[in-house]
Amino acid sequence: MIKTDRYVQTEAAGMLYRLIPVTEEIIRCVIGKEEIKGNDSLIIEKKEYPAVEFAAEENEEKLELKTGKVLASLELSSGRIEWKHADGTRWCIQDKADLTKIDVVRYTTGGEKPVINRVKTVDGERNFIQNLKPEKVRDGYRARVFFDWKEEEEIHGLGQAEEGIYNYRGHNQYLYQHNMRIPMPLFVSTEGYGVLFDCCSLMTFNDEGRESYLFLDTVDQIDYYFMGGNTMDGIIHAYRYLTGKAQMLPKWAYGYIQSKEQYYTSKELEEIVRHYREIGVP
């Protein structure tokens, strides 16, 4: 076990686990295959977090880290983490995790002029570049993080989707950005905790069949924040602490909302705004 004033790190189930107390209620869990990397997060606010007092002990079977509010118990043989209240009562179990190496690629024309094919679909006109070629950027991983939820536990969150699902238990949900889909890599539980994944790629939530897990399409490592807020307000408070306060949108983002595929010129957009303001539509 490696212990500093900021984190503890150990090897479990052939991978590296680092547990980092952010507050007494929030613990960051990073799982790497060969190393734990620093990352420039696009989700977590960049600021200095004060040091948190914690205790950590390791024996042949497990590592335990404890703050004033949360106890994390990591089983070394399996990588299973029990997330508990400080008094030992359990919130949930992160059952296991796996990382599979992949090539991270981008698509480029290689300097050629793009060959664009315009196709009319039920969602409007789509532009497809025909001469894109894959180019490897770096090595990465596909990941799965398994959870063992209680039978009556409800799972909410994951952003905005079209299906109208309130409780995701027993469901499969794809988290990707689209016209009417606004995914968020966060779920909250009726048991009084939340889990925020620091992941900007495609994700899948799966609670069908015999296994429950979240799939992460492209990551350097598994990186999530366990938030033991006890109440929904407490979880949202922890989420805001990590990601920053909710921002007020500019004036043009409020009022009448149009369902429109796209505007082709800035002049067209400005004319639409001028017309709506002229006729008194806010």
What kind of feature is each model-predicted range?
Residues 278-282:
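Short, intrinsically disordered, charge-balanced linker/junction segments flanking boundaries
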Residues 1-253, 258-274:
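N-terminal accessory segment at the very beginning of proteins
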